From Swiss-Prot:
The enzymes which catalyze the reversible phosphorolysis of pyrimidine nucleosides are involved in the degradation of these compounds and in their utilization as carbon and energy sources, or in the rescue of pyrimidine bases for nucleotide synthesis. Belongs to the PNP/UDP phosphorylase family. It is an enzyme of class 2 (transferase). It catalyses: uridine + phosphate = alpha-D-ribose 1-phosphate + uracil. The keyword Transferase applies. This is Uridine phosphorylase. GO terms for biological process: UMP salvage. GO terms for molecular function: uridine phosphorylase activity. The gene is udp. Homotetramer. Its EC number is 2.4.2.3. Keywords: Glycosyltransferase, Transferase. Pathway: Pyrimidine metabolism; UMP biosynthesis via salvage pathway; uracil from uridine (phosphorylase route): step 1/1.
Amino acid sequence: RLKVIPEKLKDVKLVCTDVFGDN
């Protein structure tokens, strides 16, 4: 789990989906 800035929340969501593949 990474601590990210709310501003990059959208990017984080995409990254999490790409890394975790949770879709």
